[in-house]
Amino acid sequence: MKSKERKSRKRWITDWWPNRLNLKILRQNCSDSNPYGSDYDYLKEVKTLDVDAVIEDLKKLMKTSQDWWPADFGHYGPLFIRLSWHSAGSYRIHDGRGGAKNGSIRFPARINWPDNINLDKAIRLLWPIKKKYGKKLSWADLIILAGTVALQDMGVKILGFSLGREDVFEADESPDWGAEQEMLSGKERFKEGELEKPFAATEMGLIYVNPEGPMGNPDPSGSAKEIRLAFTRMGMNDEETVALIAGGHSFGKCHGAGPSKDLGPDPSSSPIEQMGLGWKYTYKTGKASDTYTSGFEVIWSSKPTKFGIQYLKFLLEFEWELEKSPDGKNQWVAKNAPEMIPDPFDPNKKHKPRMLTADLALKFDPIYSKIAKKFLENPEEFEKAFAWAWFKLTHRDMGPKSCYIGPYVPREEFIWQDPLPKRDYELIDEEDIEYLKKQILNSGINISQLVYTAWSSASTYRDSDRRGGANGARIRLRPMNLWEVNHPDDLIKIIKVYEKIQKNFNEEQKNNKKVSIADLIVLGGCAAIESAAKKAGFDIRVPFIPGRVDALQDQVEEEFYREIEPFADGFRNYFKDPYKIDESDISTTPEYFLIDKAQLLKLTVPELVVIVGGLRVLGAVYSYKNYGVLTHTVGTLTNDFFVNLLDMNIEWKQIDEHRYLFEGFNRKTKEPEFKATRVDLIFAHHDELRAVAEVYASDDEKEKFVSDFIKTWDKVMTLDRFDLKV
């Protein structure tokens, strides 16, 4: 038979089995994907950057219009502000994902969103700056710096700026952006009437809300409700919301010169000869006065390259009439107003003031309107509020202030940075550490409780916005001490024991040496693991570096920590809502949320497997009910979890209606052996997880299991120790 040249499309594993648990997010952005290599240290390189030289280069670039993409009003500042805003503005507090921390706006999905049309041009305009400074300046930092410098160049007294955002070199697939099948739809996220978590945007492909109004309906009051919902979900209050919208819309314009039918595909779908640029517009020239971005033709101010209160003045003082843009979209024009707004390219042409439905929301919502009037009457207060809100918008996923770099880091510290007291005492030494371990192990707290409490404290960390973690011991403070998964009644007793040990130790010291509760919680886990390893025949030291401090209650952003209370935690075998499991949708299952949490903890697949196996045999599971504790020697650090999970002499059967709980029976005796959840069984069911589990179940890898578990434990315990990385 003659061979035929292939013309059919390749089908990937995910095409055949779309509901298979995907581990890809645990493998993305490894050191091998970074072209600078594993020895490259951006945080070291950026400290050698001449920031002032970059700022001057940016100011010059902003006022040098390029023929291939001409600048509105002769200034790219408004475009760069939009780029910075949309890079940072996709952040949401529920999982800390999105945001500006890694420059992922350069990649799908975000670069292809309809809300980000033509931001690919803004990034290309910045390429000469990036090219000049190379490895000393990341795209992530440059994108935020460009918008901040633009504000400064157009009259805003900025609060400050920090460097320190490290680039990724591949698309970030960890965020769940929604289940909608088409852009600018919100059907799935509002399926049950309320916006599902973790979403902040009200429609697919937007960073906040539809500027035309809810689902395109020009209803300012309805728009205000959506704005409040979206901005609250990204951690902004009402005053910050008004300041950001009014400040941001002081600059630039919306573009909708012609019909959307002439707009080409997004960057990822565009023809190869366009070199990664998308949205080619074939209406007239397709640029300058003929540009299409949002479909609206709106200029808010008569001075669109200068900061001021004119946006607020026009918004509140004019009456507004509904009209259609050239693309047929709903927008508003000032009633009986003169043509006073300059054209971005024709000096002989003027326009009437225009607004979006989302702008009028600030006028018709009683709370927003009151704030807007206050800002109009107090311009200096408005400018300060905008500068502070901009700083929060562009920095809130960078973590604590100790992560900030550069000459323009502000002195102020903010509650959203998880501030900590400055240590004013000497740290404990090796002799003290051994003494305190003995005190903890003899305190009456068992191994399971010690490990569970330490893990509960440290695993609150999430790398998406570098919040949470063991430093500060916020687990002992509201609201984390009330989280169901943290065993509140048990936790308060354990903390009291630690406080007694702390008090006795500190009072015994003749010098200024002290120990914090935060350090004791982690040390307790380390001591318990050493004891458990010794029972298994391994005399091994668990790394511990003191230096954590104890946060005060007023250093806890309570609203934030209430919002992020977990409803699922596979590491501790906790799942609040088993009735929501739908096996036809993997994203509803606890094993899906386990992978999601593992990514936030920066765990690889082997690290995920080994840490779960160790936590199980140590009995560190929710309510200590022994689900997943596949061993007869609880508190001994063995590989029993994997051995028994992979034992073909055990048959597993569902024991609840939700298919969450299972029981393992001896195939011969029919007697029950163990209980487990879906999270446990996934390590034998999923082929890739099983492949790793088989390594740790092997007879010759018992020591490797202990060693790898301790390495992973130490990694999680120190994820938030930025003081060690400075």
Curated annotation (Swiss-Prot):
Keywords recorded for this protein, A-Z: Heme, Hydrogen peroxide, Iron, Metal-binding, Oxidoreductase, Peroxidase
Post-translational modification note: Formation of the three residue Trp-Tyr-Met cross-link is important for the catalase, but not the peroxidase activity of the enzyme.
EC numbers for this chain: 1.11.1.21
InterPro entries given in the database record: Catalase_peroxidase, Haem_peroxidase, Haem_peroxidase_sf, Peroxidases_AS, Peroxidases_heam-ligand_BS
Catalytic activity: H2O2 + AH2 = A + 2 H2O; 2 H2O2 = O2 + 2 H2O
Active site: H86 (proton acceptor)
Annotated site location: Transition state stabilizer: R82
Pfam families in UniProt: peroxidase
GO molecular function term, any single one: heme binding
Subunit structure: Homodimer or homotetramer.
Name this protein carries in UniProt: Catalase-peroxidase
Organism (species): Pseudothermotoga lettingae (strain ATCC BAA-301 / DSM 14385 / NBRC 107922 / TMO)
